Amino acid sequence: MKTVLIVLLRFYRYAISPMLGRNCRFHPSCSEYAIEAVQRHGAVRGAWLAARRVARCHPFHPGGYDPVP
């Protein structure tokens, strides 16, 4: 499951994200964060952390440096 999520995230990062432009307010970007979270914490907790991060990535949030816990 972990490998499948990482492959899907990398596909998004290299195939879809360049067409959308740099929109993430955080460093590392949301896709980089998601890959690292899944690698470090496993599929379930990593996906939960990534979903929480994407929910915070909007124009009204200041963004900034936000590493994977």
UniProtKB/Swiss-Prot annotation:
It is found in: Cell inner membrane. Pfam families: YidD. SMART domains: Haemolytic. InterPro entries: Membr_insert_effic_factor_YidD. Could be involved in insertion of integral membrane proteins into the membrane. Belongs to the UPF0161 family. HAMAP family: UPF0161_YidD. This is Putative membrane protein insertion efficiency factor. It comes from Azoarcus sp. (strain BH72). The lineage of its organism: Bacteria, Pseudomonadati, Pseudomonadota, Betaproteobacteria, Rhodocyclales.
